Design a protein with these regions (language model features):
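Conserved N-terminal structural module of periplasmic/extracytoplasmic solute-binding proteins
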Residues: 2-108, 301, 325, 409, ...
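Extracytoplasmic/periplasmic substrate-recognition and gating elements
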Residues: 68, 167, 248-249, 286-348
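A structural signal for short loop-to-beta-strand junctions that line the ligand-binding cleft
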Residues: 100, 127-164, 304-306, 376-385
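Hinge/lid segment of periplasmic solute-binding proteins
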Residues: 105-154, 208-210, 215, 293-295, ...
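Extracytoplasmic/periplasmic solute-binding protein
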Residues: 146-150, 155, 177-230, 235, ...
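Conserved C-terminal helix/tail region of periplasmic/extracytoplasmic solute-binding proteins
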Residues: 165-166, 249, 374-425
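Glycine-centered hinge/linker elements that transmit conformational signals in sensory
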Residues: 183, 226-255
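Long, aromatic- and glycine/proline-rich binding clefts that accommodate carbohydrate-like moieties
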Residues: 292, 344-390, 425
């Protein structure tokens, strides 16, 4: 889920309301206050790349406006960076300080632990029917929707036109071999620039690795849904990355410690010539005055016919018993104005039909047209598998080691952990 930037100014008013709705948030769950009012605890991921465009400003604004319209319901906002949100939420759940509403990258493990309300319990029929059907279906586990799509994105190849021109490259690469040759040319003719930014650090290694695997007809699962992390196609993919990009110095020296945020910042600063990115990189590149192009992602033998699509998710926890209050808040958060504001702030793709119609007809989103075209052909993580969050966490920690060590061993170890997760679910 492109990513990501206009800074929203917090709309928090003075007084007690502002202190409740706009606080940075503690670790406790929501509850009923002494005055009889309910406080919902919202934990959300941060899509900003710096303090000035942190998602905290957006959620504080939504929370304040919601409480103004619903004085008996307060919203305590806690925004957490992507590197830490999974760990912090796990700690909160283990300690009993469960949030009411969580917006993050996965939901299925919470379903396995019977923590979540079904979507139909916390969304009005009007809000549910506005969700784009393919994304709503992706939120299902065994035919019941628990994950509520919040934003979506697709991936494409970004390239720096000025650096390409300096290197004498006239077209973006369409295959791995062309990408390697272009990277060599960039290294030779534009010294000091990272030819291809390969982020396999813990922020989103599962995404970068899946993109490359798709290019070799691989991926994390097979047609039957079983994990295939150490398939021959995937092993061959990482052997190519190691031998043809990492060892020759055509990317970062240690991709396993390099996060997406670093790669995006390097591209926006003109320090990286190519990378796989999502729409939020558009604004960053524009702010950095980078003359960029967008093209299909190169595969082993030609451009990918399907690309990685990402949806991030909203979910509602049962523990605090605030079903009705959560429904009111989510219906408010999913209004067209609020959804459009978030999508436009971070150059993300919509998940509701009303916002998709607005973005495709307003004429204000020409830069997103390549991504609108890619989305129908996107391939998604195995989100409905209740073990995916655990497997994804292992990929984030370890898969980057496959480009410095033995790919077969690294992927084999990951496959064993995935199989153990399946056996123990």
């Amino acid at each position: 889920m492109d990513k990501r930037v206009l800074a929203l100014v917090s709309a928090c008013a003075l007084g007690a309301l502002a202190l409740t709705s706009c606080g940075s948030g503690g670790s406790g769950g929501g509850g009923t206050d002494p005055d009889g009012k309910v406080t919902l605890k919202l934990v959300a991921a941060d899509y900003g790349d710096k303090e000035t465009n942190s998602s905290k400003a957006y959620w504080n604004k939504v929370a304040t406006a919601f409480t103004a319209a619903n004085p008996d319901i307060r919203v305590d906002v806690q925004v957490v960076n992507w590197n830490d949100i999974d760990k912090q939420v796990k700690t909160m759940i283990q300690s009993g300080n469960v949030p009411d509403v969580l917006q993050t990258g996965g939901y299925a493990d919470k379903v396995a632990d019977d923590l979540l309300y079904p979507a139909e319990d916390v969304l009005s029929p009007g809000t549910r029917s506005d969700l784009i059907d393919s994304f709503a279906r992706a939120g299902q586990v065994k035919g019941v929707q628990y994950g509520i799509p919040f934003v979506s994105s697709a991936r494409a190849l970004f390239y720096n036109k000025a650096l390409f021109q300096q290197a004498g490259i006239t077209q973006p690469p369409t295959s791995w071999e062309e990408l390697r040759k272009d990277a060599e040319q960039l290294k030779t003719r534009v010294p000091g620039v990272t030819p291809y930014a390969l982020p396999l650090g813990p922020e989103e290694a599962q995404g970068e690795s899946m993109i490359w695997e798709l290019g070799n007809d691989g991926g994390p699962t097979g047609k039957d849904g079983a994990y295939t992390l150490n398939s021959q196609a995937n092993i061959d993919t990482f052997r190519w990355l190691k031998a043809d990009l990492v060892d020759p110095g055509l990317t970062y020296a240690n991709p396993a410690t390099t996060d997406r945020k670093t790669a995006f910042a390097d591209f926006a600063a003109g320090k990286a010539a190519m990378l796989d990115g999502h729409p939020s990189l558009i604004r960053m590149a524009q702010d950095g005055k980078v003359d960029y192009g967008v093209a299909p992602i190169p595969g082993k033998s030609g451009p990918l016919t399907s690309t990685l699509g990402v949806a991030d998710w909203m979910m509602a926890f049962k523990k605090n018993g605030h079903r009705d209050q959560i429904r009111k808040f989510l219906d408010f958060a999913y209004t067209e104005d609020n959804q459009l504001a978030f999508d436009e702030t971070y150059d993300l793709m919509p998940v509701t039909q009303s916002v998709l119609h607005e973005m495709t007809t307003s004429g204000k989103h020409k830069d997103l047209e390549p991504f609108f075209a890619l989305l129908p052909h996107a391939v998604f993580y195995p989100l409905g598998d209740t073990t995916w969050d655990a497997v994804s966490a292992e990929l984030k920690k370890s898969v980057g080691g496959a480009v410095s060590g033995d790919p077969a061993k690294v992927l084999g170890d990951l496959q064993k952990k995935a199989q153990d997760a399946v056996a123990n679910r």
